């Protein structure tokens, strides 16, 4: 997609998986750049990408101003490095579904400041283990078992009983140029020398998915052209390919429909899930989160947004 092409409010809402009213609110708060054509508000893809990048820090979605908490910083694992205050509940992960969830928490969870930390699945679990957050989200695939999340929760939270709560299922696959000129169809195509990759950052679920498949095929990542070129979101992976700067990237299906010049090769269904420590499961805030996830009101937020299978939302998947 051309970075300067005009996007409508609905286009941006679809890309970010939020309601149109939320887009207007982001503009009003100065968090999302825009311009006007007559009386119509318009955006560029660069505006949306900048918003995503600027959002990758601790924020309180319920406040009108940008409320990044400067005392929460990143350690060498990409995790947070301060224990939250007693009235703070930090939900960690990168899907914008979590922005909607924390907004609902601000509405329904009394005496709690619901905060967001925008870091990937692996680092989220490390932060949960260290006590820097209360809820991690993860979509990590274990190549040996073919299972999502449970093996990683057990490894990264040793000795800590945890509860895994289902959020949504999404389809992961390859972004390729329109028409698939390189005829890319499976993981085996990564063995080819004529393909350039655009990668996600270490610890992201899509990065782990790629690395696990490479491991199973006996391929070193360093042998792939472009493997060390990393970006921080599905959107920037897709837009890099649309510009011709790479041939292939791993991401979720929804974004492919939002970026011109991109086709999507579906590969596998993934599970995106919430992880909390069992010791806080019976607290009012966690029980409120369960009620929110299971409510028709919350589920209706995703009714008109493609790419989310919410049929199991709010179900307890495993106790570790």
Report the location of each language-model feature:
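N-terminal hydrophobic or amphipathic helices and topogenic motifs
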Residues: 1-123, 129-132, 156-161, 296-320
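Flexible hinge/capping segments at coil-to-helix
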Residues: 167, 176-197
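Short helix-initiation/N-cap motifs at beta->coil->alpha
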Residues: 117-126, 222-239
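Periplasmic-binding protein-like
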Residues: 158-159, 164-171, 259-291, 310-318
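Ligand-binding cleft/hinge of the Venus flytrap
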Residues: 102-110, 188, 200-202, 206-227
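Short beta-strand-centered segments that line the small-molecule binding cleft or hinge
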Residues: 124-171
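Short loop->beta-strand "edge-of-pocket" segments that line small-molecule binding or catalytic clefts
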Residues: 84-94, 188-208
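A ligand-binding cleft/hinge motif common to bilobed small-molecule-binding domains
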Residues: 139-153, 238-268
């Amino acid at each position: 997609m051309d970075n300067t092409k005009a996007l409508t409010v609905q286009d941006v809402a679809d890309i970010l998986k939020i309601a149109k009213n939320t887009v207007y609110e982001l503009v009003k708060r100065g968090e999302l750049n825009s311009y006007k054509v007559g009386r119509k508000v318009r955006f560029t893809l660069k505006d949306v990408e900048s918003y995503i990048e600027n959002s990758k820090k601790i924020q309180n979605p319920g406040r009108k101003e940008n409320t990044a908490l400067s005392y929460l910083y990143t350690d060498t694992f990409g995790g947070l490095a301060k224990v939250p205050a007693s009235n703070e509940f930090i939900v960690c992960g990168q899907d914008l579904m979590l922005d909607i969830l924390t907004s609902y928490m601000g509405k329904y969870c009394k005496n709690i400041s619901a905060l967001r930390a925008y870091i990937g699945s692996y680092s989220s679990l490390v932060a949960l283990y260290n006590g820097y957050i209360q809820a991690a989200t993860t979509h990590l695939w274990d190549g040996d078992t073919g299972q999502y999340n449970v093996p990683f929760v057990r490894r990264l939270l040793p000795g800590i009983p945890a509860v895994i709560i289902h959020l949504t299922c999404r389809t992961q696959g390859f972004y390729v140029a329109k028409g698939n000129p390189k005829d890319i169809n499976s993981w085996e195509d990564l063995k080819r020398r004529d393909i350039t990759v655009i990668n996600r950052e270490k610890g992201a679920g899509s990065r782990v998915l790629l690395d696990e498949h490479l491991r199973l095929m006996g391929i070193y990542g360093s042998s792939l052209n472009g493997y060390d070129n990393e970006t921080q979101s599905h959107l920037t992976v897709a837009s890099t390919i649309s510009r011709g700067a790479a041939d292939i990237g791993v991401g979720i299906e929804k974004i492919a429909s939002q970026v011109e010049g991109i086709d999507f090769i579906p590969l596998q269904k993934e599970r995106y899930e919430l992880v909390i420590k069992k010791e806080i499961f019976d607290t009012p805030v966690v029980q409120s989160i369960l009620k929110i996830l299971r409510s028709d009101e919350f589920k209706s937020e995703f009714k008109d947004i493609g790419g989310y299978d919410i049929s199991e939302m709010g179900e307890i998947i495993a106790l570790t």
